[in-house]
């Protein structure tokens, strides 16, 4: 048995574009019916927005990644539009509101690791001083609220008494 050119024909469905499942149940990003291995980004389909790496959906991605609409928190490969908190990627820790990075956040916010000072939406691990949020003013050391600090701390408004990391205005 020998096969010569032209004996077998492969049909490509060129209408397949964007995210779709192949016959084995794997999800890929298609362009003109072919898996686009050059594509890395976030792509939408009917089930959500997904992290794609080299043309394949990366269901193991837990990060903050970007597409043309902004930066988003990804859990299990999917943008988590319900998440509000602080999430990490290779560039730092970011304030997330409804799944998207809030680059306007200048506050003290919390995640499962503690309370952190954010400037421009990013945790500033170099910040040392006092900073406020909706719950009060806090002593920040290395970008995190120092709940072990009791003593005096100064900022541009004066010298303040701090108890367990929080400014005590009653003294």
Predicted region positions:
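Extracellular adhesion/carbohydrate-binding repeat motifs centered on closely spaced tryptophans
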Residues: 1-171
